[in-house]
Structure formats: structure tokens, C-alpha cells
Amino acid sequence: MALHQSLLDLSELAPHCQSRATARGLLAEAQDILRNAVAHQDNEIELSHWYSHLLVDIVRSPGVNSPVRLTGAAARGDQLPSMPVEWIGQDSDLQEVFSDVGLQAHEAADSIAARVDAGLPLGNGGEQALLEEALTKRPPTLKMVDGLPDRDAAVDIKATLLSPIAAIARWAAPGPRPTVDRLAIGVERAVLTATDAESLDLAWRTGYALELRRWYERVSDRPATLRDLPPLDRTAYGSACR
């Protein structure tokens, strides 16, 4: 599905941003346009790629010209507005640019995951370290009651679904690319089976749709339980967690 012209127009402006004040305006407008796209049920993965590239272009633009190197979801092409923008390096003013429009942003903690997402060399023993990091992200088993997911179980889409899958994909295919692409490459490298990659891809897309919808509804930063989710979202979340 082709992106709406309004998204394409804004993405053309981002690399030519001439001031940090203009950057704030572009970031605010991006959220408004993104909300419209979500309302029209545009593809969540395509929207995250668009939003990620927009952030990268703004940070590199003449008006911002930040010395930092983006990492995390933005560098991978997985960024959503409910996720913190992360970078390697120091720029105290940059955090303010994002926070002024309601976005979380901060310098990333030093880790192999941050370095890999930023496109820095993996180094000796890097893949083993990524595997160990992925294992630490393994979420707890979803609590069941009478054969169904416990409706009082806490819902944390990023910690339970997105972060563990991103860590597996990072190990399967190190490099700054979207998680869905990493999973596909993991199959080509024979470190993931096609069945495993397909299951992870489906869970990732499900989690992304849920996370983006909660941001659209302005509840992504609120604690929630399965009981709080609409029935279809509750079913989708439970299936993805399995």
C-alpha cells in the first residue's frame, strides 16, 4: 500500500530542516499525520519505516546537525512515537527538541545491542553476546486461568512482545535494519527456521499493531491488564504471547 502524499511531502522537508524550532514543528506535524494514517488503517510496518527515516533525516538536517548517532528502533526502522528515541553520543539540547513535542528521548546505555543497531562493528564474540542478550529478554509465560489467558495479567507490549523479538532478530541478522527484515535474513543464514521466523514475524506485526493503536488512543503510557483491552486485541495479544 502506497503511503499517503501528506507523509511523503513531510519526509521531503525533513532533510532540509533549517533550525531546531522547525524540527519541533516537523515532529509535531508528523504525529498528527501519523494519527490520520492510523485512522485510515495504513500498514503499521510501513508507517514505522516512514517515521524512523523522518527522525533520522531531522537529526541529520542542517538545522539540527546533531553529532549523535541514532540507535535503537529509529536506527533499525522500527520507531513508533510511543518508543523512546535513543542515540549514542551527547547532545543535551536534542533531548529537549523531542520532549517539547511529547516524545521520549535519551542517550542509550552502552550495550552491544545499541552498538549493533547503530551500525557499529560487532567485534569478536559479538554474536554469542547477542544470543545471551536475547535470552535475557525472554518474557515470562503468560498466566492461564481455566485454559484462557488471565484477564488480570499485566499488558506490556514492548517488554513482552516487541523487545524479545527484536533481540532475537538482532542476533539472527546483526545490522541496522528493520526487525522483519532481520527475521527473513535469519532464515537465509540458517539460524532461524522458516516456521520460527514466520511465527515471530506474525507476533511482531501483531504487537506493532496493538502498540500503535494504543498510542493512537493516547493510552500507551498507562498501565493496563488484559481486561482493559478490547476483545479482539485481547485475543491477538494472547495468541502472540504464546
Which ranges hold each PLM region?
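Conserved nucleotidyltransferase catalytic core and NTase-mimicking acidic/glycine-rich helix/loop elements
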Residues: 34, 38, 122-242
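Intrinsic-disorder/low-complexity, polar/charged segments
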Residues: 1, 15-23, 43, 111, ...
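Conserved catalytic core of two-metal-ion nucleotidyltransferases
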Residues: 69, 88-141
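N-terminal regions immediately upstream of nucleotidyltransferase
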Residues: 1-66
